[in-house]
Amino acid sequence: MFDIGFWELVVIGIVALVVLGPERLPVAIRTASHWIRLIRSTANSVKSELEQELRLQELHNDLKKAEQLQMSNLSPELQESIEQLKAAAQSVTRPYEQQNTIHPAPAAAEVKAEPAQPAAAMTHDEAPMVTTVQSTDVLADKKEEVKP
C-alpha cells in the first residue's frame, strides 16, 4: 500500500520504541491499529453502498430503455388503446381531485339569517319559561337513564 519494505518497518519500530518507551508503545500500537481498522471498514462500507446504488441506477436506466423500445415498437392500434387507458385513468382521478379541493364559502346574500330579538325586548315571563322547559326535559331524560 505505502510501498514500505521490511527494514523500513524495523526502523520505524525502533524510533517509536525510543520516542514512546516500552510502556506506552503497546497502547499506541493498539490505538493506531483500531483507527486503521475503523477507517478501512468505513471506506469499505461506503464503497459497497456506492456500488449497490450504481447497480440500481444502471438497472433502472436499462429498464427505462427497454420500456421505451417496447412502446415505440407497438402497433398503432395498441398505442391508441394505451392512450385511451391513460385518458380513462385521468378521468377517474379527476373527481377525487375535485373532491379534495377547497371550494369558496357561499355568498352572504344566499344565507339569510332571521334577525334575533334582543334580550331586552323579551318580557320577563318568556325567558324563564324557555329555560324551565329545557331543564325539565334534560332532567326527565336523566331520570329515565338511571332507572333499570
UniProtKB/Swiss-Prot annotation:
<comment type="function">
    <text>Part of the twin-arginine translocation (Tat) system that transports large folded proteins containing a characteristic twin-arginine motif in their signal peptide across membranes. Together with TatC, TatB is part of a receptor directly interacting with Tat signal peptides. TatB may form an oligomeric binding site that transiently accommodates folded Tat precursor proteins before their translocation.</text>
</comment>
<keyword id="KW-0653">Protein transport</keyword>
<keyword id="KW-0812">Transmembrane</keyword>
<dbReference type="Pfam" id="PF02416">
    <property type="entry name" value="TatA_B_E"/>
</dbReference>
<keyword id="KW-1133">Transmembrane helix</keyword>
<keyword id="KW-0997">Cell inner membrane</keyword>
<protein>
    <recommendedName>
        <fullName>Sec-independent protein translocase protein TatB</fullName>
    </recommendedName>
</protein>
<dbReference type="GO" id="GO:0008320">
    <property type="term" value="F:protein transmembrane transporter activity"/>
</dbReference>
<comment type="similarity">
    <text>Belongs to the TatB family.</text>
</comment>
<feature type="transmembrane region" description="Helical">
    <location>
        <begin position="1"/>
        <end position="21"/>
    </location>
</feature>
<comment type="subunit">
    <text>The Tat system comprises two distinct complexes: a TatABC complex, containing multiple copies of TatA, TatB and TatC subunits, and a separate TatA complex, containing only TatA subunits. Substrates initially bind to the TatABC complex, which probably triggers association of the separate TatA complex to form the active translocon.</text>
</comment>
<dbReference type="GO" id="GO:0043953">
    <property type="term" value="P:protein transport by the Tat complex"/>
</dbReference>
<keyword id="KW-0472">Membrane</keyword>
<keyword id="KW-0813">Transport</keyword>
<dbReference type="InterPro" id="IPR003369">
    <property type="entry name" value="TatA/B/E"/>
</dbReference>
<keyword id="KW-0811">Translocation</keyword>
<keyword id="KW-1003">Cell membrane</keyword>
<dbReference type="GO" id="GO:0033281">
    <property type="term" value="C:TAT protein transport complex"/>
</dbReference>
<dbReference type="InterPro" id="IPR018448">
    <property type="entry name" value="TatB"/>
</dbReference>
